[in-house]
């Protein structure tokens, strides 16, 4: 179900938590979900990004495009079972060898998600679970709903699509109010930015390693 909340004027929660969750609002929003998921890593972190997903999921929704990460190597790990996916995520997070570990995982229990959060803290990295919905219990500190928005107007041709846009809803959080933000992909910098700031000169990026607002994509 799409959010009825207006776009928030509050700052976007840029810096990722050790463990987050995000789901697509509708099946057609899976590409937007993956774009958002891959963005939850700090700018300047050159460690690889790992994606663990069932083979059936990859066959249905496609494989992430590694060069779109803007320099970070992509490790794609097809799995068969939820247990296998959770094991891969936990080992990757605990190792500290990756900047981000994303798992298309359904049905993770509260205990399993707590193990992932603990592993992420141990490894100094970020984990993101991408279930079908947010109905279950989870240790994730932020839980998001992602939907696709009409693209921006192309600056050189109003008949052509411009930069991809997505709406992100913070549905649940520890210590933060729910909110909705519009983000936009910058294809030149491989970054997601707040869409309403792109017209400004020198807009801040979302999720920087130095703690300033910024978010890698």
Describe the residue ranges of each PLM region.
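N-terminal regions of ATP-driven nucleic-acid and macromolecular assemblies
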Residues: 1-100, 105-217
């Amino acid at each position: 179900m799409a959010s009825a909340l207006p776009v928030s004027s509050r700052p976007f929660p840029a810096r990722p938590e050790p463990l987050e969750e995000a789901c697509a609002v509708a099946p057609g929003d899976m590409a937007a979900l993956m774009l958002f998921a891959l963005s939850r890593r700090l700018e300047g972190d050159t460690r690889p990004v790992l994606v663990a997903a069932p083979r059936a999921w990859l066959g249905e929704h496609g494989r992430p495009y590694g060069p779109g990460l803007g320099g970070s190597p992509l490790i794609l790990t097809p799995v068969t079972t939820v247990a296998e996916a959770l094991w891969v995520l936990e080992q990757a997070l605990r190792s500290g060898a990756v900047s981000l570990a994303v798992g298309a995982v359904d049905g993770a229990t509260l205990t399993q998600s707590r193990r992932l959060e603990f592993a992420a803290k141990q490894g100094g990295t970020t984990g993101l679970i991408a279930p079908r919905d947010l109905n279950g219990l989870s240790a994730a500190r932020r839980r998001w709903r992602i939907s696709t928005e009409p693209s921006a107007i192309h600056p050189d041709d109003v008949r052509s699509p411009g930069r991809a846009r997505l709406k992100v809803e913070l549905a649940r959080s520890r210590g933060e109010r729910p909110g909705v933000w519009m983000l936009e992909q910058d294809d030149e910098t491989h970054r997601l930015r707040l869409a309403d700031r792109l017209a400004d000169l020198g807009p801040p990026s979302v999720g920087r390693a130095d703690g300033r607002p910024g978010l890698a994509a």
